[in-house]
């Protein structure tokens, strides 16, 4: 198993082999994310829509007025001229996605031969090991659509470099903070803080859950937990550990702990943390389905008769027959299987094949989360984002909640903190 502490140290130090590999990967990805290759494509427009949903006005948040210095960020990755920040962000996040999948495979590979890198990055290698809903088509597997020799070389260099860190004995415990710290190292603080990204320390999640379980007057092993804004999964991991401590021989833990998040990288990180806990014991013969979903808990699907109206968050709203939703919940298909179902063949037909698979994955996650069983304890550290940084579309879609829950009852001096709308 990889020594994540040593990985973290090398990523921070500029004169180390791993830091050099990171810089070369990010620059290579940046080169291939040339807007002339992508702008105008349906997939690019969908990505831009979701980016706005997650971060609001990205150009405003990454502007000099927001104290984000493109020059100093470019220096870190060896750029001669200041890079375009949204493009740099996508390059950095793509690198993190590749890194985290390599770490995930290392936690469970055992005696299994190393799969081709294309199978690992696409998620097929994990499906072949019986692990479902880990990863698939997302905004960060775009290199597979090109798979130029330069891209392949950089990704293989990263995999080879990580082998030097495979020093921890089998069964070692993965700290729930480790992956968050790696993300915080890969994505420079200036970018993270401009985007409002902060993570909850493990000790705080543990203390919070202990208090919640104590107040419930039940054992953790008898409860179901949900984190509707799970981030990197720190609350999920603490809940899994509490359940296992209470019921060492109990039912599969994945039936009891679930998480939602809007950010695809947060979801991926949470799944790696979740998988690391589950992989410490033999996986069920039927395989393992990871109940962590790309889902916006404030923008839930709407039931209209026999149809579930789902906002994908990418500018597309889909009317999905309720009967198809029930099949998806029962069968848990992958995106390709889902689109082959008779009732799904008319969905997303305006998109290119890779776009259809990506959006089908988003639809499935919305469906699975919407029909997920009720929880006894809702846990987590809710995201905090300034109102003016939310996209206009998100403000309009969620504004009714503030009145319904009495959140606009502000009087006196506190009116100075209110916004124009």
Residue ranges of model-derived segments:
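N-terminal secretory/membrane-targeting helices
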Residues: 1, 138-146, 315, 323
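Intrinsically disordered, low-complexity terminal regions enriched in charged/polar residues
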Residues: 1-41
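Alpha-helical structural motif
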Residues: 3, 18-21, 25, 43, ...
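Non-transmembrane, amphipathic alpha-helical segments
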Residues: 10, 39, 43, 87-91, ...
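Solvent-exposed, charged interface segments at domain starts and junctions
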Residues: 23-34, 46, 90-93, 300-319
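Class I S-adenosyl-L-methionine
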Residues: 26, 30, 40-48, 52-67, ...
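Short linear interaction motifs
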Residues: 73-89, 354-365
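SAM-dependent methyltransferase catalytic region
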Residues: 170, 178, 184, 188-421
């Amino acid at each position: 198993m990889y020594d994540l502490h040593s990985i973290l140290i090398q990523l921070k130090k500029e004169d180390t082999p791993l830091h050099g590999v990171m810089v070369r990967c990010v620059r290579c990805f940046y080169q291939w994310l040339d807007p002339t290759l992508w702008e105008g494509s349906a997939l690019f427009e969908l990505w831009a829509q979701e980016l706005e949903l997650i971060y609001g006005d990205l150009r405003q948040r990454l502007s000099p007025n927001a104290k984000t210095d493109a020059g100093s960020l470019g220096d870190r990755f060896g750029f001669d001229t200041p890079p375009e920040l949204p493009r740099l962000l996508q390059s950095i996040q793509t690198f993190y996605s590749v890194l985290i999948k390599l770490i995930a495979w290392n936690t469970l590979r055992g005696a299994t031969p190393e799969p081709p890198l294309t199978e690992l990055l696409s998620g097929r290698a994990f499906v072949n090991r019986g692990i479902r809903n880990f990863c698939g088509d997302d905004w960060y597997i775009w290199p597979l659509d090109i798979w130029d020799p330069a891209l392949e070389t950089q990704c293989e260099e990263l995999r080879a470099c990580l082998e030097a860190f495979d020093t921890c004995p089998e069964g070692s415990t993965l700290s729930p903070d480790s992956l968050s710290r790696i993300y915080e190292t890969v994505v420079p603080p200036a970018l993270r803080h401009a985007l409002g990204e902060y993570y909850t320390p493990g000790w705080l999640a543990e203390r919070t859950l202990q208090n919640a379980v104590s107040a419930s007057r039940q054992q953790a092993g008898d409860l179901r937990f949900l984190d509707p804004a799970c981030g990197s999964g720190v609350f999920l991991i603490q809940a899994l550990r509490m359940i296992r401590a209470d019921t060492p021989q109990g039912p599969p833990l994945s039936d009891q702990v679930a998480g939602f998040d809007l950010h695809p990288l947060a979801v991926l990180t949470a799944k790696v943390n979740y998988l690391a806990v589950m992989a410490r014991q033999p996986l069920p013969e039927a395989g393992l389905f990871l109940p962590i979903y790309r889902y916006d808990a404030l923008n839930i699907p709407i039931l209209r008769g026999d149809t579930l109206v789902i906002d994908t968050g990418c500018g597309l709203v889909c009317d999905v027959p309720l009967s198809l939703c029930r099949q998806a919940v029962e069968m848990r298909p992958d995106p390709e299987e889902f689109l082959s179902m008779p009732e799904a063949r008319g969905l997303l037909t305006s998109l290119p094949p890779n776009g259809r698979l990506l959006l089908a994955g988003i639809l499935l996650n919305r469906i699975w989360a919407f029909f997920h069983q009720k929880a006894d304890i809702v846990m987590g550290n809710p995201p905090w984002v300034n109102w003016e940084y939310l996209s206009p579309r998100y403000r309009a879609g969620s504004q009714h909640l503030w009145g319904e829950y009495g959140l606009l009852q502000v009087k006196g001096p506190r009116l100075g903190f209110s916004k124009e709308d």
